Amino acid sequence: MPRSPIDRPSRALQPRNAADLSRRELLAGAGAGAAALLLEPRGLQAQATSSRDVVFAHTTVITADAVQNDVALAVAGDRIAAIGPTDQVLKTYPQAEVYDGRGKALLPGLINCHAHLAQTLARGFNEDFGFPNSARLAIQPNSLLRGEEETLMVTIGALEAIRTGTTTIVENSGGIGRHAAALAQTGLRCVFAESVRDSENVAGPMSPDGLAKSEAPRFSPRLRDEGLQRITELFTTWHGAKQGRISVFPAAALAETASPELLQAVRAFAEKHDVGYTIHLSQSRPEVDFMVRWHGVRPPAFLDKHGFLGPRLFAAHCRYVDQADVALLGRSGTIVSHQAAMAANRGVIPPIALLRAAGCPIANGTDNNTNDVFEVMRVALLTERVSRNDAIPGLRPQPEDMLEDATLGGARAVQQATTLGSLEVGKKADLLVLDTQRAHLVPAGRILSAWIHNGQPSDIESSMVDGQFIMRNRKVLTMDEDRLIADADRVGRRIWTEVQAAGPIAVPGRPRR
């Protein structure tokens, strides 16, 4: 399919490695700022000088509804150009670089629809105190970040995302502009969901006294205008940047911190610019109680009353929903972003089976601390099986359902289902190379099932976004990984030492220390 030079990105393709076989052998089927601190001197843009196409030869191609064995997949520019018999594809692309696909499987890149990358700092703490967090720290860790250290936390989260199979990530936070350049240079496909609120007296579920002691919300036109201006400025600067790899969506932070006017403005912005929008929804009991107390309705009904629900919206969490909420979300076609691993940490299993049945498309996200969508797929499968009341337990959902949620489901949420989410000719070349020759993956009656149930993120050998390798042979190409890890560890140790010096951390059920 012809594309203009503006649409055609440059590509960072590496020389053939020693394990790759010759074209003749393959045809014969023989044999088996802050960003500057964090990225390698020869980062992605410096590497992106080759114009060669790539053929993954004699490989397995996996999508949610099909597995094709011993085929080739060709990448030309930023698109998948062909899938078919290896000899035919190699003859069609005689100048392409050849990637030996024997013992490998190609999957669509995973899409993380809900991440808070700066919260990477809270690893080893935020998982174990419930939600809202019951630990009353004398000082909040994020308040101790200095200068560009917050961008450091964001970027270490992006590094984890790449290593665990993410190719598209939705960063949901306020002030994303501070980290936008660093995120763009990671090579990930990014959606910057700039989060805004206009309540001047309700801090949300993480406020020191919690929502239970909150007073009636007061809304500030000034805060609303400032938030909408941030969205507009971020959109103007970044939407469509990096050959379309960067998108900007508006986000209302929380139902309890949003006025009707803010909700309407966020949706209007999304419709004007033909993008999606997002919100945290029904993530805690205090949120539900607060909305009923001060607005007279549960959170989904409040959003519906003010025209916020709909198929452009992907709502994160939906943990505390009743039958009426589920029906309302389903009728509106609202997409639910399911953060299964974090939900399990919180001790809550959202009624995903009921939401599916009601008509809600499901996507996946990670939320805080970790950015591993592979883990999310496995936890989502197991927790949904446990929560269902099927006559024969353990049949639903299937691994194919989980892959669809994490790929095509995410593509629908970010309004890019025509170009992302599956391995099809004409779609973007956002893909993973899975090494199937691992002790925990062989033998395998169904390779996708084996990977979801038994696999590890380290099985991912290479990943590609827009036809460019961002990880190859388990080496991330867009960052100085060793330096990044060392810097993040140093900063984290300093901050947690200061937190513990300010007051003890009481672990539930354990002695104070």
Language-model regions, residue ranges each:
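Histidine-rich, glycine-flanked metal-binding segment
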Residues: 30, 39-43, 48-53, 61-107
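Metal-coordinating catalytic core of metallo-dependent amide/deamination hydrolases
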Residues: 181-319
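His/Asp/Glu-enriched, well-ordered alpha-helical/loop segment
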Residues: 305-312, 353-438, 454-457
